[in-house]
Amino acid sequence: IFVNKMDRENADFYKVVEELQSKFGAKCLPVQLPIGAHNDFQGIIDLITMKSYTGFPPEEGEIPSSLQAQAESFREKLVEAVAEIDDSLVEKYLGGEELSLEELGDGLRRAVVAGRIVPVLAGSALQNIGISLLLDAICSYLPSPKERNIAVIGDSDNPETLEPSQDAPLAALVFKTSADPYVGKLTYFRVYQGAID
């Protein structure tokens, strides 16, 4: 989940996280925190690396001291949730050892693929703050189409699952059609199997 428009008036990342958790449960966990809000929005704190990224292009730095305790608190909740995905990580965590960045990243990815954690990120698309981190998170933590169960088609009495394959018959879903005065009619679709030549 990407909480956008952090540079706008009335932007409140923590209220959004609280509402997400009350609606969908505690599995909606921040993996980033905003630095400031409204006109003072400056950047993002990455809870995996515990680094701050401010401005555009993002400059890596240390977490501001005023947000250090809050970042550590949110990171502790994230690490605890990630550790629960694997017995060896639970043992390491309960033994008081720090999880490495690789273990934390891999564990988060497995938890997201399993549906046990929904990562919550923040940023401002208009100011291009947090967007590169959003794209990195999509590549690092979200499942590829081959790792997900493919859509089921047909009625409930005769369901059929689709496996991703270029050799299979085409199955696609049109999700948007628009008209552009210069290009003409544009149709956006998601290909579930097959190929379009």
How would you describe each model-predicted region?
Residues 1-197:
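Structural and coupling elements of P-loop NTPases
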